Regions:
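Strongly charged
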Residues: 1-14, 18, 26-30, 38-95
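Glycine-centered, phosphate/nucleic-acid-interacting loop/turn motifs that mediate DNA/RNA or nucleotide
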Residues: 35
Length: 95
């Protein structure tokens, strides 16, 4: 299998897990399969969707809070501490 440095993409479920959005990778896959996650405005139900640096993710938070929009700024090499995970993305706040 190719090392991460040789690829310009990463599986969506693995990136979610490394970015610490969920505790288990299976939970990430189940969340994505719900069809509410969007990559660059395109809905996806595929945990194996390819995620690249610069992609914009739209994630549902809850009915009251609406959505969370983030930009991928790095691909993960491992699941590290929360401080490290926070460096994988940046929040996009609407004016």
């Amino acid at each position: 299998m190719a090392e991460l440095e040789d690829r310009d993409w990463q599986r969506l479920d693995k990136w979610f897990w490394c970015a610490r959005f969920m505790k288990a990778r299976a939970d990430c896959a189940h969340f994505i399969a719900g069809g509410l996650v969007r990559i660059n405005c395109q809905p996806t139900e595929k945990a194996h969707a390819r995620l690249r640096i610069g992609d914009v993710l739209t994630l549902p938070i809850n009915q009251a809070a609406g959505v969370r929009v983030i930009r991928v700024v790095a691909l993960a090499t491992r699941r590290g501490p929360a401080v490290e995970a926070r460096l994988l993305y940046e929040e996009i706040v609407e004016p």
